[in-house]
Design a protein with these regions (language model features):
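An N-terminally biased module of ancient metal coordination in phosphate/nucleic-acid-related enzymes
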Residues: 1-59, 63
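Active-site gating/metal-coordination segments in enzymes
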Residues: 58-124
């Protein structure tokens, strides 16, 4: 489909069982690999998007970094990181294409609000 418009998928998950997953309140999602995503969205002509870490991926970055490397320019990551993440790790994620950090207060083990505020300031 070519409409002359640039399409950006603002929120999608890659669930690749080659990488660590953590059951979230007893739920582990079914596989949805990057190949599955591409097959499902190829007819739409999507040219970029935001790969979002789910709570079931905890603080593991390996799947996200692999996905961003495979997707290339135009794609960004949204991740979850512990509130004690070193500045060097935050910078490394930024270099790899991570552009946002999400704080999953209920299911993601994000920590308390004061520590999250400090982390948010370091990320920004």
């Amino acid at each position: 489909m070519s409409s002359g418009r640039r399409l950006f998928d603002s929120h999608f998950h890659v669930i690749d069982h080659r990488f660590p997953l953590v059951a979230n309140q007893g739920y582990t999602p079914p596989p949805f690999s990057l190949a599955d995503y591409r097959a499902a969205t190829n007819p739409l002509g999507i040219q970029g998007g935001a790969v979002v870490s789910g709570s079931f991926q905890a603080f593991d970055q390996s799947y996200l970094l692999a996905s961003l490397a495979a997707l290339g320019p135009g794609w960004v990551g949204v991740t979850q990181i512990p509130d004690d993440s070193p500045d060097a790790e935050i910078a490394r994620l930024g270099t790899a294409g991570v552009r946002a950090v999400r704080f999953n207060i209920v299911r993601g083990g994000a920590g308390d609000f004061d520590r999250l505020e400090a982390l948010a300031r370091r990320c920004h």
